[in-house]
């Protein structure tokens, strides 16, 4: 549960904005979507390796 203390005289829109920002930072929605279906650890690891290789090729192309 997220708790956002509201300061005296604070606008409700600003408090909602702080709540939404804190909610996004916690990654709750991202975590729920990831848990909808089981993904094998080997598949997760393979995806991470492919992503790292892609980022490395982008960095290499920028350097040359």
Swiss-Prot record:
<protein>
    <recommendedName>
        <fullName>Small ribosomal subunit protein bS21</fullName>
    </recommendedName>
</protein>
<dbReference type="GO" id="GO:0003735">
    <property type="term" value="F:structural constituent of ribosome"/>
</dbReference>
<dbReference type="GO" id="GO:1990904">
    <property type="term" value="C:ribonucleoprotein complex"/>
</dbReference>
<keyword id="KW-0687">Ribonucleoprotein</keyword>
<dbReference type="InterPro" id="IPR001911">
    <property type="entry name" value="Ribosomal_bS21"/>
</dbReference>
<dbReference type="GO" id="GO:0006412">
    <property type="term" value="P:translation"/>
</dbReference>
<dbReference type="Pfam" id="PF01165">
    <property type="entry name" value="Ribosomal_S21"/>
</dbReference>
<dbReference type="InterPro" id="IPR038380">
    <property type="entry name" value="Ribosomal_bS21_sf"/>
</dbReference>
<keyword id="KW-0689">Ribosomal protein</keyword>
<comment type="similarity">
    <text>Belongs to the bacterial ribosomal protein bS21 family.</text>
</comment>
<dbReference type="GO" id="GO:0005840">
    <property type="term" value="C:ribosome"/>
</dbReference>
